[in-house]
């Protein structure tokens, strides 16, 4: 294969991460400019239907999560009569915030009651919002106050197993990054100086790259990484002649073989890069705000849908609420029920649609929150937000982004997915807690086991009305990768008067943004259809 500038930059990105590659590209004048794509959604205006379309038009929305409530909110702006049917007793669906008073019985029959102190909580579901997501636009429109979310913190730890002396050792992100970037910069600079890139880069290019690498890796004058203040201090600099004592770097071979840099690219991601945001008081604040705008008289909580059928008058939905069987017929229906659960309803959907719904496979994910009566992560580890990462089943430990310097706080003791979450799924809450504490203490020490006031956990595969964290499309590896599966495309089409919406029908699966954009798309299609049929 020809060795080109493009292949060189691609390899640089694979080994050093997007930050290293992009920095080098900028230095060489190769980095492209970026521009946000134009938004095409046009919100419906108040009175869009009045005096323009004959008669009234009604929509029944199945599900009071992000897609369902957003659909109802936008449709009401134009004068549609909307009824939302939600099986739970709260809005938000998989956007679920556990706080004092929360109670949940899972599919195993175990009931948990949350006893966190007033003002303390954690988000069992969605917890962060990227700057690019329209979720922030709705926070603005609905008056939901937001605050910064610590998605990355140089003081949190990485702890991985390997065949090196770093195996099972907790290393701060700042130290891991300083050593990894330092040694990589040293090796790349050496390769550049020895002529390995002569067929790719001009003399001026190499000079610019060497200058960049010297700065990026904090290299010595002779191009070596000898350590850096970037990795932290054993004793902090102070007054007078107290210059501090820098932490010594790990050996190059240990750093490379240990894989301590395996998670650095996480916050390079378009939807994970700082700044990130979250609502003050919990993510569910957004959906209580939607509820207030829509009106509780237009939302039926505790409504378990049993049937959804196209009929001559539109769509008839049957459900149970308060121990009684009820039904509603509307001109249109928007179904936001998780796709793998729709087939359980009595329905008259075509076979190919039912097959398409089954192609959206459920996934495993869960969290456990521990309330500590002492914020040891701040006072002892100097950690204010962010997450420690590990290859243990707990995957990561997320620290509070609020109530700084107070006397207590809720730590998310694990946020795991896939096979790692399956290790927790069949356990009782007490067993989950014990496992989380045992693994967490191997990262943060014995203090992790003390001063525990209460705890609460959630596993989405075991949660009624969800039975999944998010959808993975069969044959697509869980994401579309620029091309949709036939089953996915099938569900983008209405079945007579029934429309489907949700994050599973977006290119932002598992994000609120995905559900909200899907809802907007369906609202637009319904409104255009009503106008055309008038």
Swiss-Prot record:
Cofactor binding annotation: Binds 1 FAD per subunit.
EC code(s) of this entry: 1.4.3.2
Range of residues in the leader sequence: 1-45
pH dependence: Optimum pH is 8-9.
Reported modifications of this chain: Predicted to be exported by the Tat system.
Catalysis performed (reactions): an L-alpha-amino acid + O2 + H2O = a 2-oxocarboxylate + H2O2 + NH4(+); L-asparagine + O2 + H2O = 2-oxosuccinamate + H2O2 + NH4(+); L-methionine + O2 + H2O = 4-methylsulfanyl-2-oxobutanoate + H2O2 + NH4(+); L-phenylalanine + O2 + H2O = 3-phenylpyruvate + H2O2 + NH4(+)
Residues that, per the record, bind substrate: 128, 272, 415, 510
InterPro entries: Amino_oxidase, FAD/NAD-bd_sf, Flavin_monoamine_oxidase, TAT_signal
Biotechnology: Can be used for the preparation of D-amino acids by resolving racemic amino acid mixtures and for the production of alpha-keto acids.
Cofactor dependence: FAD
UniProt: FAD binding residues: 66-67, 86-88, 94, 125-128, 305, 503, 510-512
Enzyme class: oxidoreductase
Subcellular location: Cytoplasm
Main location: cytoplasm
Domain of life: Bacteria
One Gene Ontology term of the molecular function aspect: nucleotide binding
GO BP, sorted A to Z: amino acid catabolic process
GO CC terms of this entry: cytoplasm
Function: Catalyzes an oxidative deamination of basic, hydrophobic and aromatic L-amino acids, thus producing hydrogen peroxide that may contribute to the diverse toxic effects of this enzyme. Is active on most L-amino acid (39 on 43 tested) with the exception of L-Thr, L-Pro, and L-Gly.
Subunit structure: Homodimer; non-covalently linked.
Record family assignment: Belongs to the flavin monoamine oxidase family. FIG1 subfamily.
UniProt protein name: L-amino acid oxidase
